[in-house]
Amino acid sequence: MMMENSGSLWDAARQFFPGGVNSPVRAFRAVGEEPVVAVRGEGAYLIDADGRRFLDYICSWGALLAGHAHPHVVDRLSEAIQRGTSFGLLSPYEVELARAIVASVPAIELVRFVNSGTEATMSAIRLARAVTGRNLVVKFAGCYHGHVDGLLVAAGSGVLTFGLPGTPGVTEGTARDTLVLPYNDQEAVEDAFAQHGERIAAVIVEPVAGNMGVVPPAAGFLSRLRELTRQAGALLIFDEVITGFRLGLGGAQERFGILPDLTCLGKVIGGGLPVGAYGGRRDLMEQVAPNGPVYQAGTLAGNPLSMVAGLATLELAREPGVYGRLETLAAWLQRGLEETIQESGLPAHVQRVGSMLTLFFSQQPVTDAQTAERCDTARFAAFHRAMRAQGILLPPSQFEAWFVSLAHREEDIDRTIEAARKALAEVARG
């Protein structure tokens, strides 16, 4: 196949895909740029169709804990593909990955693999409604749980990036079954349970919000959710599609010491291949077909290639010192960015949990969707363009997380800090 350049590929893509892309944020519209057309990844670097190398902090939106094309993952995949690409039957590879997940994630006793994070949250919500006999689901403004109809109401990620209140096509009936509250607002949650507690099937939450930028939970917020759901007989669902195996082997629930009833996973557990999973207490998961009446199925669920890539990634994650190294590199990056912000005189903040972080152009820290929406998107766009011009690839939205991978090195962090110093100075000059 003759390789076209980025410009011609972008022209062709617009002929075939809505907006030229298969996921909206990839269009780079929020930063006023043409998209990066990726053809290859090597460690912490991504190479576009014109041969330009970018130091990558998108990392496939957090899926690439080990970086691009890690030799261990590639070797395992090369072996696996010789055995077949899909069976549609039980295989040892899904058993091995499930064993690793159950051994690592405190709240998961049984797990079901699906093909995406969206499928995971959709299936968890269905299960919660079935076992409680209730319809109402509580979510938080700015938290994104995939493109499930009922969870797109006041969502984060691309919905927030493009300034959309929700999306057409979601019926009023579906929206009525979703109660949207401010993230980190314990009082609002308490009021909701006081008024609607008997109708609430579940509360679904990103334990660390990653889709309005990185927003950590306020002290006591997650524990209060746990108390209120338990008292009301509702389920607590942690959407750990981003944080699962990103913040540690046990994810956010281990980091904060709060155990949900159900957990949704994705991204890292597929090692860069399509995957999702939901799991939780045995008594709940036993209600999923074929053991129970809650139906859910998928032709490619437990796909052997995804399972092998995920298991290879988790093998790397279990090596001694891995999460300590990620923490050290990300903290180093945060400190360097904060120093450059201070030098620039710009109103900006860096928020980080583990190896995920965001630089917000804001007068105050971001604690919820409302404060996220006050951020200066024009300044972020200028910053993004200046960083890209220096070969640093950031998410093309202020409301997406940056990710540090195992492939990033100290010299990469230093290079990023120096590039940010120049970019922020350029933004400050206007």
Swiss-Prot record:
Transmembrane feature ranges: none
N6-(pyridoxal phosphate)lysine: residues carrying this PTM: 267
Database matches in InterPro entries: 4pyrrol_synth_GluAld_NH2Trfase, Aminotrans_3, Aminotrans_3_PPA_site, PyrdxlP-dep_Trfase, PyrdxlP-dep_Trfase_major, PyrdxlP-dep_Trfase_small
Pathway assigned in UniProt: Porphyrin-containing compound metabolism; protoporphyrin-IX biosynthesis; 5-aminolevulinate from L-glutamyl-tRNA(Glu): step 2/2
UniProt keyword annotation of Protein transport present: no
Catalytic activity: (S)-4-amino-5-oxopentanoate = 5-aminolevulinate
GO molecular function (one): glutamate-1-semialdehyde 2,1-aminomutase activity
Gene Ontology BP terms: protoporphyrinogen IX biosynthetic process
Chief location: cytoplasm
Alphabetized Pfam families for the sequence: Aminotran_3
Keyword list, A-Z: Cytoplasm, Isomerase, Porphyrin biosynthesis, Pyridoxal phosphate
Assigned protein family: Belongs to the class-III pyridoxal-phosphate-dependent aminotransferase family. HemL subfamily.
HAMAP family xrefs: HemL_aminotrans_3 (MF_00375)
PANTHER family: GLUTAMATE-1-SEMIALDEHYDE 2,1-AMINOMUTASE, GLUTAMATE-1-SEMIALDEHYDE 2,1-AMINOMUTASE 1, CHLOROPLASTIC-RELATED
Protein's UniProt name: Glutamate-1-semialdehyde 2,1-aminomutase
Native source organism of the sequence: Thermomicrobium roseum (strain ATCC 27502 / DSM 5159 / P-2)
